Amino acid sequence: MSQPQDAPVKKKRPPMKEEDLKGAKNKLAHQVPIKSKTYQVMKECEQSGTMAPSVFSQNKTGGETAFDKPKAGPAKSVFG
């Protein structure tokens, strides 16, 4: 006959130590430069005094998207 399936056992988190919190706060306090492309663009726009491009803006140039533009030529066949 079939046996009842065991329910997954939930594990409890270990108790948080004050030393762990201090170490995490110290890591956050370090001045690590942000390497995000979005952050770079925002910083450049802020320094030049212009507004950063937005996907919600009505003034789109078309360069804001990461998708490839379709080529002007006719589609090529995969068979030849």
From Swiss-Prot:
Q: What happens when the gene is disrupted?
A: Morpholino knockdown in embryonic craniofacial and dorsal axial tissues results in head and body axis defects with abnormal head chondrogenesis, small or absent eyes, reduced body axis length and tail kinks.
Q: Which domain of life is it from?
A: Eukaryota
According to the record, the residues making up region (Disordered) are 1-27, 50-80
Q: Name one GO cellular component term.
A: nucleus
Quote the biased-composition stretches of kind Polar residues, using this chain's numbering. Answer: 50-62
Pfam families xref list: Mustang
Give the chief site where it resides: nucleus
Q: Where is this motif: Nuclear localization signal?
A: 8-16
Listed A to Z, the keywords are: Chondrogenesis, Nucleus
Q: Which InterPro entries match?
A: MUSTN1 (IPR031394)
One GO BP annotation here? Answer: chondrocyte proliferation
By sequence similarity, the record places it as follows:
Belongs to the MUSTN1 family.
Which purpose does this protein serve, as stated in its record? Required for craniofacial chondrogenesis.
Q: Can you say what this protein is called?
A: Musculoskeletal embryonic nuclear protein 1
Native source species: Xenopus laevis
Taxonomic lineage: Eukaryota, Metazoa, Chordata, Craniata, Vertebrata
Q: Which gene encodes it?
A: mustn1
